[in-house]
């Protein structure tokens, strides 16, 4: 393998969770990046997103949501900063409209939004995880980010540690094409090479949902476990939809969560509804994210009623569709009376 282009070439078959757990590297090619520059960038975003931006440290990474006035998620972000810029990572398919909407509210704030997806420093994004990923990365990084949702900035790029999966750390490495050309052969020699869907499969098994075009305005943050993941700060000031998000938390009316399932149906995809066999006439939830599991089926994060999770008899698409096999989540689904 002589170049990073060859590393990013798509392998014929998706990786299995067993392969991911051992160690993998995969291109993350479907994510966009919004950059905000200017002295009021943090205060502007603080008034738009569900999480605290004003106190975001240089070594920190946070999840955050961007809601409609009705409290429904328009986007979810992975968010970090350097000395001058705040970055918001989100699916490329929704980046342009979300960036345009955010820009509408800048008004007189001293901040400028731009598309950083193709900037030289972020031209290549690789996802790594599994038991062998740490050792592979130690060839270039010392120390590695110490805990989930932390990062290090390095001459070779930005290394972000995200939520663990399969009992091992996972990382995103944002780098230039020149760096990728150097490191790709070594990574590919030590780790299983996956497609972008391998990264999404690892995200699903980490219990990290992401809003895509198919699921915009479908969920209040708590429905996809966002407050359990530290993505909602209930002490911060107002943002679009804040009153509804707070009411959902403290009045306990949602009674819904997102959980991990496996489905022996390759048609499972974000936005597809699911049905409880006990109540076949109306959907009990919706697929949030899905990825091939290397065994001919799909693993997915599915939002649904707590009663349906407890009954564990749910089908895809209709009450007669493919059954959902419920898997253990990597964190406790504390109902919080939702």
Where are these predicted regions, by residue range?
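Anionic-ligand-binding alpha/beta catalytic cores of soluble enzymes and soluble regulatory domains
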Residues: 172-262
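Glycine-rich, small/acidic residue-mixed loop/short-helix segments
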Residues: 224-231, 246-338
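Short amphipathic beta-strand starts and helix->beta connectors
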Residues: 13-21, 62-76, 106-109, 152-160, ...
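Short, surface-exposed ligand-recognition loops at beta-strand->loop->(often short) alpha-helix junctions
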Residues: 35-41, 128-132, 262-269
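Glycine-centered loop/turn motifs
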Residues: 59-60, 144-153, 267-274, 312
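Acidic, low-complexity central loop/insert segments
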Residues: 24-26, 32-33, 78-206
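Residue-level recognition of beta-strand microenvironments
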Residues: 116, 162, 207, 237, ...
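Acidic, proline/glycine-enriched N-terminal capping motif
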Residues: 1-63, 67-74
């Amino acid at each position: 393998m002589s170049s990073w282009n060859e590393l990013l070439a798509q392998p014929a078959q998706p990786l299995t969770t067993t392969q991911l757990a051992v160690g993998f590297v995969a291109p993350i090619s479907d994510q966009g990046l919004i950059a905000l520059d200017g002295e009021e960038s943090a205060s502007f975003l603080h008034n738009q997103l569900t999480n605290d931006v004003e106190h975001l440290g240089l070594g920190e990474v946070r999840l955050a949501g961007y809601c409609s006035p009705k409290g429904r998620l328009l986007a979810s972000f992975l968010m970090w900063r350097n000395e001058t810029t705040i970055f918001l990572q989100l699916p490329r398919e929704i980046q342009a409209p979300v960036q345009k909407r955010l820009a509408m509210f800048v008004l007189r704030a001293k901040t400028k939004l731009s598309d950083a997806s193709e900037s030289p420093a972020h031209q290549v994004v690789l996802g790594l995880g599994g038991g062998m990923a740490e050792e592979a990365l130690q060839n270039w990084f010392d120390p590695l980010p110490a805990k989930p949702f932390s990062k290090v900035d390095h001459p070779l790029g930005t290394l972000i540690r995200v939520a663990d999966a399969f009992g091992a750390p996972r990382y995103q490495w944002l780098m230039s094409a020149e760096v990728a050309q150097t490191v790709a052969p070594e990574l590919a020699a030590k780790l299983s090479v996956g497609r972008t869907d391998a990264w999404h499969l690892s995200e699903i098994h980490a219990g990290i949902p992401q809003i895509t075009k198919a699921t915009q305005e479908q969920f209040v943050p708590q429905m996809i476990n966002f407050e359990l993941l530290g993505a909602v700060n209930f002490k911060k000031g107002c943002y679009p939809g804040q009153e509804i998000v707070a009411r959902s938390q403290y009045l306990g009316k949602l009674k819904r969560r997102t959980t991990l399932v496996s489905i022996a149906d390759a048609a499972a995809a974000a936005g597809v509804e699911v049905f409880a066999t006990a109540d076949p006439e109306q959907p009990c939830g919706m697929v949030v994210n899905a990825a091939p599991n290397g065994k001919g089926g799909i693993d997915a994060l599915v939002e649904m009623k707590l009663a349906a999770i407890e009954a564990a008899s749910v089908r895809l698409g209709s009450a007669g569709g493919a059954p959902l096999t419920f898997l253990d989540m990597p964190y406790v689904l504390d109902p919080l009376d939702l």
